Amino acid sequence: MAITEIPYADYADLFIEKESHGGVFLSTCADGKNNTMTIGWGSIGFMWGKPVLTVMIRKSRYSYELIEKNPEFTVSIPIHDDFKKALGVCGSKSGRSIDKFKEASLEIMAGQKVTPPVIKGTGLHLECKVRYQQTLSADNFNQQLCDKWYSDQDWHVLYYGEIVSAYVEK
């Protein structure tokens, strides 16, 4: 399988489409343990003179524990709909108790410039190094959104990751 580096912005629309309609895989790694989860919220753009991918991870998630130890992550975007079942598994099970890669029949490939792996066969990959993070809180938050998404106080942490590599599998 060949890997072709791409300008990250060339596939920004695809990232947004897939993320908002079914999700994408976010993978982390620390202490020799890999994990992946399905995410459906985030943004892609340009900040601090760098390409940036912003993702959200709740503090209750196993991925949060790993990214706090190793501030790198990958996002694998399924170009085709072959990963619907795997996205369901990775969005509903915890990596603390199972190997989600095995459970969802996912193959991994080593990241090119970061420690976390990418999901083989998805087609599009973004590798990121965290440059800033911030925990959401009720302060200055729209009350309706706060009531809807954070009534249990399980806040997201926003991770602003510099995109250090973007590529497609061919």
Question: Model regions: which residues?
Answer:
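Active-site-proximal mixed secondary-structure blocks
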Residues: M1-I39, S43-K170
